[in-house]
């Protein structure tokens, strides 16, 4: 009503909001908000609710069937995998390789929080996910740049293209592969925000 937010995030799980509760809630608010759903972390079922209600992203996906992956691949929803949660809770990673092989849009995020993902280094997490899931450097870097921007409804940034906002970070290296090879130890040498460089 007061336009304080343009996004809603709902956790769809047996011990949070049920599939029915989430469906009823999202049906009422989907015309006014971007939707993100945290789903399929421990049980399947929530992904379909998110996709059916036009979610921009569905996050987690550690527990997901082939049918759900196929359903996601035929939608505009970005699947966001959260390797920090898997590391923090000792559960398997979301099947990022299979998601990409099905042509799903896949982003990588940290879900940094004190309960299940207390490690905040996205590059370290993305590097470990890439090694475990057999992702290429390009797939991992896309997952934390352009696809991450899509998951946040920020299509005006995330890649270096004419007409897009020049938000980026730079690393002092002669080989872009060093960024992931160093698993978070290589730190940015500069930040560029809206075309302005900060050292």
Residue ranges of model-derived segments:
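Structural signal for hydrophobic packing residues in well-ordered secondary-structure cores
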Residues: 1-2, 29-30, 148, 152, ...
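Metal-coordinating catalytic core of metallo-dependent amide/deamination hydrolases
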Residues: 1-45
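Receiver (REC) domain switch/active-site residues of two-component response regulators
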Residues: 6, 56, 167
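Generic beta-strand/beta-sheet core signal
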Residues: 11, 38-40, 80-82, 109, ...
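Active-site-adjacent C-terminal substructures of enzyme catalytic domains
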Residues: 21, 44-159, 177, 183, ...
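Hydrophobic anchor at the start of a short beta-strand
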Residues: 35, 106, 189
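C-terminal cap of metal-dependent C-N hydrolases
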Residues: 144-146, 162-199
